[in-house]
Amino acid sequence: MSPLAWKIRLSLGVKGLTWQSVQTPMSLPKPDHFELTGGYRRVPVLQVGADIYCDTHLIIRVLDRLHPSPPLSPPGQETVEHAVSRWAETSFMMVILSFFGIGGIFAEDFVEDRQKTMIPPGTDLEGASRIVGSKLIQIRNNIERLEGMLEDGRSFLLGDTVSAADLSAYQGGPAQYIDEQLRQEFVIRNRPGARCAPG
């Protein structure tokens, strides 16, 4: 599932809203999705009645407007919330998602689709999967940044209540899929004999 779709699911839960979802294909073609969105290919998409909202940040604003309590973008902290969310959805999320290249988690058609639209030409995907050590350091650095924001004892990144910044920083959606691979990587790094283990 898309990490941004995961964020919107969490947002709906924080607000205590009843909702339904549909799964769309990860790669083209997406005929039902395109018909709904007028050609917009990304997820998530929010439908409220006859209105369709694309873009995660817009969806958060719409949810806050339609259901103000609790606010996902706290009044007076909108700029900070947006900055932290943007950081979490780029720097932090991208390093987590880089692990998806390890072990062929994604279907070949998905990788081909993303190579056409998101990955710069000439990117060595196989080589990228060999730089696990540096990616683990980046993950640790990002987690330390988050911990630094919480050093003063606050419960959440922007204060005492959960915000969209927290939901963006929570990487449980994508991380649950790479957890086993990360564990395996640590085993291989710490116990070279594990590489030769039968089975």
Model segments located where?
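GST-like fold's C-terminal all-alpha helical module
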Residues: 88-195
